[in-house]
């Protein structure tokens, strides 16, 4: 049957196979996480998630500040170059 498939059909089937494998791996990972934190209280897990959220927010703010600084610096460099000519 596979010899009757077009290249596009083979490609789609390969992508579905890859997706199925990824979902299986995700399911195993989630199962492992559930078993690992079986003894943890929901409040403790929630507190850990809040701490992670704060850290992610801080990293995001620092990244935005860095990008903004680079944009301003390039804009200033660009404005200075034409005046030097």
Curated annotation (Swiss-Prot):
It is found in: Nucleus; Cytoplasm, Cytoskeleton, Spindle; Chromosome, Centromere, Kinetochore. Component of the DASH complex consisting of ASK1, DAD1, DAD2, DAD3, DAD4, DAM1, DUO1, HSK3, SPC19 and SPC34, with a stoichiometry of one copy of each subunit per complex. Multiple DASH complexes oligomerize to form a ring that encircles spindle microtubules and organizes the rod-like NDC80 complexes of the outer kinetochore. DASH complex oligomerization strengthens microtubule attachments. On cytoplasmic microtubules, DASH complexes appear to form patches instead of rings. This is DASH complex subunit DAD3. Component of the DASH complex that connects microtubules with kinetochores and couples microtubule depolymerisation to chromosome movement; it is involved in retrieving kinetochores to the spindle poles before their re-orientation on the spindle in early mitosis and allows microtubule depolymerization to pull chromosomes apart and resist detachment during anaphase. GO terms for biological process: attachment of spindle microtubules to kinetochore; cell division; mitotic sister chromatid biorientation; protein transport along microtubule to mitotic spindle pole body. Keywords: Cell cycle, Cell division, Centromere, Chromosome, Chromosome partition, Coiled coil, Cytoplasm, Cytoskeleton, Kinetochore, Microtubule, Mitosis, Nucleus. Belongs to the DASH complex DAD3 family. Transmembrane segments: none annotated. Residues 13-41 form a coiled coil. GO terms for molecular function: microtubule plus-end binding. It comes from the Eukaryota. GO terms for cellular component: cytoplasm; DASH complex; microtubule; mitotic spindle.
């Amino acid at each position: 049957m596979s010899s009757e498939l077009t290249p596009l059909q083979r490609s789609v089937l390969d992508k579905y196979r890859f997706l199925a494998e990824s979902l299986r791996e995700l399911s195993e990972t989630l199962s492992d996480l559930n078993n690992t934190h079986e003894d943890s209280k929901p409040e403790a897990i929630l507190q850990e998630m809040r701490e992670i959220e704060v850290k992610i927010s801080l990293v995001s703010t620092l990244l935005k500040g860095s990008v903004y600084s680079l944009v301003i610096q390039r804009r200033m460099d660009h404005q200075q170059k034409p005046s030097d000519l």
